[in-house]
Amino acid sequence: MMTLIIPRKEAPVSGEGTVVIPQPAGDEPVIKNTFFFPDIDPKRVRERMRLEQTVAPARLREAIKSGMAETNAELYEYREQKIAAGFTRLADVPADDIDGESIKVFYYERAVCAMATASLYERYRGVDASAKGDKKADSIDSTIDELWRDMRWAVARIQGKPRCIVSQI
């Protein structure tokens, strides 16, 4: 996918007036995970989260690795239980398949994608003191909150736990 940005007619044009964000170079290797959890392909993360080439490969890789490490930590006890039950990989744990993929693997990748993207968005917020900038920051904050929620829900789904716990005081 290539993104082409063409300025509005009334906007001042400098140089050629067109900015082209090129396609990914295709040289982003898959990130190897621990023995139990699936490897993560940065290209799939870019596609799922619509990041295109607006994020440098090194930054995306760091965010994904952080997302993998944190998700793995969240699922440590779950992993130990499944290993004790005789499963060597998350993909081997009994679960429904959707589109040929274990739903547990799908939710794992969703958790990593959401966490990596939330982390990137938190660090890429623009600085704009105008009212328009405040509105954009509020929108980004809302998106970040939704991504963190998606991560928590995906982890809960892997563990077979409810997405939220409500108690009466």
Curated annotation (Swiss-Prot):
GO terms for biological process: viral capsid assembly. InterPro entries: Phage_head_completion_GpL (IPR009225). It comes from the Viruses. Disulfide bonds: none annotated. To phage HP1 protein ORF20. This is Head completion/stabilization protein. Carries out the completion of filled heads by rendering the newly packaged DNA in filled heads resistant to DNase. The protein is assumed to bind to DNA-filled capsids. Transmembrane segments: none annotated.
